[in-house]
């Protein structure tokens, strides 16, 4: 039986227009996101997850980017159909360039990536599709 969870995250742009991506457990690359805690709004969860996974906490909210559904990433990079996630995403900007994941065991690396290289780096196809869909609304 498939478990359904609600997740929130963000596309974070720095002053050079680069996008923040994070390594998940040393095996996959993703936009920063994670589960919404009890009593937390999706936007609050997104900001918390960005901080935990990358160390970036100086965020300026720009806009809601909508949501999409996807299965959890399996160890082989495919779909783990045991968990279906509804992922709500937000756009943030930051002037903070230094990265330092707080949860370094689960997220050993975060990096700034040129916008044109992000989709190729993301592991899950649904993350790639979502990113490619929202690129036109991202500020230059």
Residue ranges and their predicted role:
Residues 14-57:
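Conserved Nudix-box catalytic region and its N-terminal flanking loop in Nudix hydrolases
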Residues 1-19:
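Conserved N-terminal beta-strand and adjoining loop/helix that marks the start
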Residues 55-98:
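Active-site segment of metal-dependent pyrophosphate-handling enzymes
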Residues 30, 84, 112:
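Short aromatic/basic micro-patch
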Residues 7, 83-85, 105-107:
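A short beta-loop-beta micro-motif enriched in histidine and acidic residues
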Residues 89, 93, 100-132:
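NUDIX/MutT-family hydrolases
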Residues 3, 28, 110-111:
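A residue-level structural signature of the nucleotidyltransferase/glycosyltransferase Rossmann-like core
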Residues 133-138:
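C-terminal alpha-helix
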